[in-house]
Amino acid sequence: MIKLNFTNFLEGNKSTEKIFKSYASKIETLNNSIEEKKCKGASMLGWMDYPSKYNKNEIKELINVSQEWYNNKKIKNVVVLGIGGSYIGVRAGIDWVLPEFNREKEIYYVSSMSSSYVYSLIEKLKKEDFYLIVISKSGTTLEIGVAFRLFYSLLFEKFGSEGAKERTVAITDKEKGTLRKIADTQDIQTFSIPDDVGGRFSAITPVGLFAMGVMGLDVNKVLKGCAKAIEDTKEPDIEKNTAYQYAALRHYMYSKKEKYNEVFCVYEDALRFFTEHLKQLFAESEGKEGKGLLPVNCLFTTDLHSVGQFLQEGNQIFFETCISIKNPLNDVVINEFLKDEDGLGFLNGKKLDYINKVAASSTIDAHHIDGKIDIIQINLDNRNEESFGYLYSWFSKVVAMSGLLLKVNPFDQPGVEAYKSRMFTKLKK
């Protein structure tokens, strides 16, 4: 499902073959530690098992409830309260599969404490009906706790206790935590977050699957793609495992070429939030003990008109990873216009996706040939549930190997607690 292209990376396939050989033994050893669950952070490898060993009854119930919400034409709005992996991966999946506009339901995400944004959304929803999805393992995440107070209170005011709970689903710990306690007290429908799956790996669990189902995605196809990726990436031989090939090249650029930034490039608006997911995935997994590549995401060609100058001629502290989709979800043909007074008559009859792909290939040529930038290309055929699930789990295996190559625990994020403890101290004064 995934094809890697190394044509514009160093000197091409000859270079990558040498790198793969140099990493083969180390990769095999680390792969065994992952598969045998003996690696650093092994207690949080549940995302590897989930696509094939999930609770069948829970997912059946999740699909039934999400389809019921999706089929209710009277309620057009869905509000998702989540932050980090409880938001980014969810949105990445929905945006990956659906067209940007004219969706069956409008979805709004509350993932910050911006008073202006929250006020504006509350004012809108005072006049309209909506469903509420709150996602928090503990229920003590401040951003989500505050948002849940505000939006559940709004439902309560509009529809009473019974109406509020009918319009709400909580995704949380199966037994403990503040949100679990509230959900049980209020008799709110819940789905559980597995104990052994961290936030940035969790969009393939009820964390993401419920919202995806509400928006009309086929949950089973997402899980099918995930399971296929996990199976494909069990292979210990780096020559046969694209995830480990990519992990090795990333580590090589960091450790041997002193490239400390990775720029993720996409040419489709719908893929932007997948690169936001990658930003979190790699930053939280690798960024510890003074180590790690800093992930940067760019939407081209838009960002070629902002950071393009730096990428072409600036300080080369980075390499690029470009993700592309062969077949667009939809396409547009360029029409004749005002007797071609704009000078663009040579584009008449051409498809917009073709023009976009010419821009992509031209950028790759300019960056690699002229700018001497090393570029890894990741190519997929289609945007759909299965390809999203596959790529999501494929990158999860990449980051597991990448973190272990750096000799860090890829599955914790202790640094995130620093701002939280200071914030709570100040707020309680």
UniProtKB/Swiss-Prot annotation:
Keywords: Cytoplasm, Gluconeogenesis, Glycolysis, Isomerase. GO terms for cellular component: cytosol. The keyword Cytoplasm applies. Pathway: Carbohydrate biosynthesis; gluconeogenesis; Carbohydrate degradation; glycolysis; D-glyceraldehyde 3-phosphate and glycerone phosphate from D-glucose: step 2/4. InterPro entries: G6P_Isomerase, Phosphoglucose_isomerase_CS, SIS_dom_sf, SIS_PGI_1, SIS_PGI_2. The active site is at 284 (proton donor), 305, 420. Its EC number is 5.3.1.9. It is found in: Cytoplasm. PROSITE patterns: P_GLUCOSE_ISOMERASE_1, P_GLUCOSE_ISOMERASE_2, P_GLUCOSE_ISOMERASE_3. Its main location: cytoplasm. It is an enzyme of class 5 (isomerase). GO terms for molecular function: carbohydrate derivative binding; glucose-6-phosphate isomerase activity; monosaccharide binding. GO terms for biological process: gluconeogenesis; glucose 6-phosphate metabolic process; glycolytic process. It catalyses: alpha-D-glucose 6-phosphate = beta-D-fructose 6-phosphate. It comes from the Bacteria. NCBIfam families: PRK14097.1. Catalyzes the reversible isomerization of glucose-6-phosphate to fructose-6-phosphate. Belongs to the GPI family. HAMAP family: G6P_isomerase (MF_00473). This is Glucose-6-phosphate isomerase. The gene is pgi.
